[in-house]
Amino acid sequence: MKESERFLEKGIYKAFKALGEPTRLKIIKMLSNQGMCVCELSEVLDMLQPRISQHLKILKDAELVVENKEGYFVCYTLNKEGLERLWNDFTLFLEADVTSLPGYEKESSRMSNLSCNEKIKEIKGKLQKEC
């Protein structure tokens, strides 16, 4: 497997999709302060417990939170290792050569041809004349 293919495997897309929903981002913030159970998150966020559970499942599937049994309750905390791995993988993704990333072939080709793209030259020419 190419190094560039790891980005899809490691769940960068899944994690950012999970974080892209406002309620889930709020849950992440709440859990950054302390571990919490569904009933606590439900109270703090003023949402029904089943909805909170759905959000937590998505965050857990994206490896952003972990659950721990505490008696009758399940306590959720941030998955610090998962968040660190996400940050490291995202940094590698940003540093990777776009030509080596699967799914970026068309964009990579267009980027390499920008300097000779007539449409871009025309737009830049008009903007320079206006300034």
For each feature predicted by the language model, list its residue ranges.
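Compositionally biased, intrinsically disordered low-complexity segments enriched
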Residues: 36, 51-52, 56-57, 69, ...
